[in-house]
């Protein structure tokens, strides 16, 4: 992807989340970009994230999809409210389906879209694709937190 600044870098440059925080030196650094009504990302696996040789660990897959879908929700909640900055959102519920082994020899691609939206929550469906095949899908509910919640100021 050629986009210069991801949602994470633009709106939460000091975020230390292991999955998507730009400020976490040991993190996965998921970089999500709005595109044609969806949010997309490309991520290159490293061997240290393998479950076994050549196959990405399922927990890492879950983290990638969770963070990417969370940012999809935050972005769309921001647009829905006509705000300049996304609300801090957290995962309220989340389901992932691992459909096939995810190879680590090339980039994986994430895509997510909102399927239901209210003022403070979004239901998001996402996919992780590798080698031209969908390897995992997810569906989650992500909620904008209110002041007083531990995650309120994380962005």
Predicted features by range, described:
Residues 1-51:
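Non-catalytic linker/capping segments at the edges of enzyme domains
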Residues 1-8, 102-109, 113-155:
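HotDog/MaoC-like acyl-thioester-processing domains
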Residues 36-38, 56-84:
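Active-site helix/loop of acyl-thioester processing domains in fatty-acid/polyketide metabolism
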């Amino acid at each position: 992807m050629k986009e210069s600044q991801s949602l994470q870098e633009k709106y939460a440059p000091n975020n230390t989340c292991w999955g998507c925080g730009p400020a976490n030196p040991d993190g996965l650094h998921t970089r999500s970009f709005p595109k044609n009504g969806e949010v997309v990302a490309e991520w290159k696996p490293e061997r240290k994230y393998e479950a076994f040789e050549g196959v990405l660990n399922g927990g890492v897959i879950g983290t990638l999809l969770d963070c990417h879908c969370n940012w999809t929700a935050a972005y769309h909640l921001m647009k829905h409210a006509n705000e300049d900055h996304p609300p801090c959102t957290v995962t309220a519920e989340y389901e992932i389906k691992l459909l096939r082994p995810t190879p680590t020899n090339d980039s994986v691609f994430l895509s997510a879209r909102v399927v239901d939206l209210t003022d403070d929550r979004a239901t998001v469906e996402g996919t992780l694709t590798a080698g031209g095949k969908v390897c995992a899908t997810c569906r989650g509910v992500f909620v904008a937190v209110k002041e007083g919640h531990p995650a309120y100021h994380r962005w």
